[in-house]
Amino acid sequence: MAFRISPLWWPVMTAASPVLVPMLLRKNGRFKKNLTRANELNQERIERAEPLELPKLDFLELTVLVEEKTQEGFLGDAGVSYLFRTDQGSLLYDVGFGPTRPAMAHNAAKLGFTLDQVDALAISHLHCDHMGGIPAQRSKQVTVPEEMGLPGGKTCFLPDEAKAEGFTTELVKGPRLLTAGIASTGPLARSLFILGWTEEQALLARVRDKGVVVFTGCGHPTIEIILKMVRRLSNEPLYAIGGGLHFPVTYGRGNRAGIQFQMLIGTGLPPWRQISDDELSSTIASINEAAPKHVYLSAHDTCDHSLKRFENEVNAETQVLRAGAKYHL
């Protein structure tokens, strides 16, 4: 059994309990209020969403710049950066831990990728593993490794208020087309106990003779809510789902000092509750009900136990995304 917090920390926590317990109780009150608020807001957003005129793309190609799992010669990290290319242009989705860890710059260089090869950047949500590192999250400023070149004023599509040096920032307030024939669901909310109110946008695109492809960053709003929005935006068949779903059931990625951070701070549960196989089973059932033909799993926020269950139990061709790999969607 993996402890979410190493027993070495337990004496410290016991000593700190007179301060820690009241703080957790206050946070729990805010967390519960925000749970209700997020559910109501998402429902309102879905109900008022209008169908999007998604262009029929002749092709949609994904190159994975940052992921936990890798092709040989690439660096893995518990973050995400996906490059989408279409017959109408290209869009970079997230920048992993940016310049604070080596994976983004190393993998981009190995792939020969620089920012002048994309039309725009979209950030799924304002967490460190997607917007460029812990300093980026604290300052709410998207940060990209300088080795990847200058942004040159290109658009950075954001789901919430933030800055992005060198980019022209554009706040996405609802479902809309972005660039390269790729659209955003608009921000969808989730209350997280430690990280607080989180807005996340997923991407969707329509591929000719196939259907709609949906990609998430972490999937914090849950894939069920994201797919409800997608159904409002398009009546085309669902062809593929990809990206993070956040299921660290048995352990988390990127653990530090004996603390399983992903199991504590990103699950949408209070820290004394652990995300379970029952919740994983519910999500697997929801994906099977949606009936995509392909599922592309992110390992950056999902443990190997959960990945294996997805691969074995989802009724679709399922594979785990790897940094350095290309996928023709």
Q: Residue ranges of each PLM-predicted region?
A:
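Internal active-site segments that recognize and position negatively charged phosphoryl groups
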Residues: 181-186, 203-223
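Short, well-ordered alpha-helical microsegments
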Residues: 100-104, 131, 164-165, 222-225, ...
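Active-site metal-binding motif and surrounding structural segment of the metallo-beta-lactamase
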Residues: 102-154, 233-246
